[in-house]
Amino acid sequence: MEKIEEQFANLHIVKCSLGTKEPTYLLGIDTSKTVQAGKENLVAVLCSNGSIRIYDKERLSVLREFSGYPGLLNGVRFANSCDSVYSACTDGTVKCWDARVAREKPVQLFKGYPSNIFISFDINCNDHIICAGTEKVDDDALLVFWDARMNSQDLSTTKDPLGAYSETHSDDVTQVRFHPSNPNMVVSGSSDGLVNVFDINIDNEEDALVTTCNSISSVSCIGWSGKGYKQIYCMTHDEGFYWWDLNHLDTDEPVTRLNIQDVREVVNMKEDALDYLIGGLYHEKTDTLHVIGGTNKGRIHLMNCSVSGLTHVTSLQGGHAATVRSFCWNVQDDSLLTGGEDAQLLLWKPGAIEKTFTKKESMKIASSVHQRVRVHSNDSYKRRKKQ
């Protein structure tokens, strides 16, 4: 079996999205999980203007666009069993659209509690439960839950919450990720540095909390890895990386597999630079965890993850001209979608003929959007390098 680092190194750009009337940062990418004969594969992209664009994957042409106006959208996720696409909104709702229909109004609206501002969310693997994380308001930072199923007895398009967890985070809940195969397991990350694992099949919040891990810094990304997805990885807004093994919770073995306060200081990039982390990539067939990072000039780095540390393996270049903010790996055809601050969506495929195009420079972005998308900062890193 070809290793993922070999697949990654063999990627070439086959398609670049056409320009849009309003260029935006591309902050998140997800692809439709359903494949239907005679129908295009869909890609959903979260944009910094608060909208979600739906693309045809092969042509990278915009099919339609959904807006959260007057709120801003955070996160994008396709359902696992249909072409519904979800996003959390700062107006206190999670919205659901039919990605194949150009209808402005959501087909479902999941309402939060008064004063909720949602900045993260996920839907579980059987599409039954949605969980969204809030900004801290007064002393409350919540995880709010809904039943996502359509009920033939209740045709209402608006749903109220099933309930909420309110005791386990003390600051903004920046990340929510359900387990890939267990619909009752969910992990949340926060600006308070805590990463909490819950079994939502248990009635009350205190008993549902399986374990708490501490990244000591604001969480920017979390995910599941390992055989049976019994491990959790975490990245922080100051480019830290943490990796925990839940198999060791009831043993004498350490739960922490890896703890790196600043990846930029420890990974040997040879002549290249590493400016930020983008996300993680667990390859189930080879049981390997990889970390994706990049440079402010648009290079994309693949690093292997082991208990001994992170190792730079290979890089992609010639695509983006600015910071890369999002990616989505397709295990079916080993293709890669990337998006960033140059407003371009790129499709990479293995062994393809390289497509040439003109790079776009990074765009200016409004300070309000800068704050919302939590732009990674090099300031602390530069200060430490001077010391």
UniProtKB/Swiss-Prot annotation:
Record keywords, A-Z: Repeat, WD repeat
InterPro entries linked to this entry = WD40/YVTN_repeat-like_dom_sf, WD40_repeat_dom_sf, WD40_rpt, WDR89
Protein name in the entry: WD repeat-containing protein 89
Q: Which SMART domains match?
A: WD40 (SM00320)
Which GO annotations describe the biological process of this protein? Answer: corpus callosum development; ventricular system development
Q: Where are the WD repeats?
A: 21-65, 68-107, 112-156, 168-208, 214-254, 319-358
Species name for this entry? Pongo abelii (Sumatran orangutan)
Provide the organism lineage as a comma list: Eukaryota, Metazoa, Chordata, Craniata, Vertebrata
Q: Extract the Pfam families matched here.
A: WD40
The transmembrane residues are none
